[in-house]
Amino acid sequence: MENDIYSKQLQQKRLDDAGDFPKVVLVDTVSMCNLRCSMCFHQNMKRKKGIMPWDLYTKIIDEIAVENKDARVWLVFFGDPFVIKRTKPNIFEEIAYAKNKGLTDAVLNTNANLMDEEVSHRLIEAGLDAIYIGLDAFNAETYVKLRVGGDYQKVVANVLGLLRLKKELTSNKPGVYVQFVVMDENEKEVDDYKRFWSEQGAIVKIRPKVSWAGMIDAPKQILDNKDRWPCHWAMQTLSITDTGDVVLCPCDLDARFVAGNVRKSTLKEVWNGKLKELRTLHLTGQYEKLPEMCRICRDWQSARSDYYSLNPL
């Protein structure tokens, strides 16, 4: 098990330091969410929830466009993007701004409960590159236990509607990914899930549960920290809250460790400051010198996924 995980991350070059600028940037355009999911710490998040101001958002996007327009940019961090589908600015304007600046890999993550046909149209019009939809069950009974407050049939209809609309408009974007976080409650549904959604034309993403840096239980994290290797998220990802704080990694929902703020500094400056020091500790195996949150975390072994599709990926 250990060698399989480690070898896969090495093969995907996920353990390399990204260098002077991150390969992945998470932008917390909105930190509010409409569900209470069992695999997510969001419902217990203590920091104030909000919406990123437009001037801060554009500052971030403008720098990415100059430094690395091919970086993967997640236009949502801890919330659901369609909470701001009717605000000013809204998520569609934010997508369009990023694409107009030349970004090549603008993506969203959503539970899809707030989607509808209009949302699908606007995502395609804005030029979104990919959308990842959290749908961790093949049966409605399992779904409602895991994604509390969600409507399974509505989500399935929304995903199928987006796939159908892409065909009608002969659009190859956005890539539609359905994500399944494997847990005891749903693991027997994986095969049916993979078969059904692959046949519908979606790309299936199967991934392990994370503990959000020790905040919830993730019993399938069976490797001990004495066997650890550098964390993929630490090596390649810059995570920015709606206030501009740069936190330790995507698992730091409560902003327990703040490396800097991109209102006061550039992304590049923050990336090459405290975060670079932490990356060096990872690369040299000095894990005992990391901040406590990172030192005790076991999510380094969960930074991986398997993908399935009937079409070449």
List each language-model region with its residue ranges:
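Short, charged low-complexity intrinsically disordered segments located at boundaries
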Residues: 94-98, 186-196, 225-226, 294-311
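Short, acidic, Ser/Thr-enriched surface-loop or helix-capping motifs
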Residues: 240-243
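Conserved glycine-rich "GG(E/T)P / GGGxP" loop and the immediately following alpha-helix
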Residues: 19-215
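Short, small/polar residue-rich loop motifs at catalytic or cofactor-binding pockets
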Residues: 232-234
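C-terminal accessory region of radical SAM enzymes
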Residues: 164-177, 197-226, 245-304
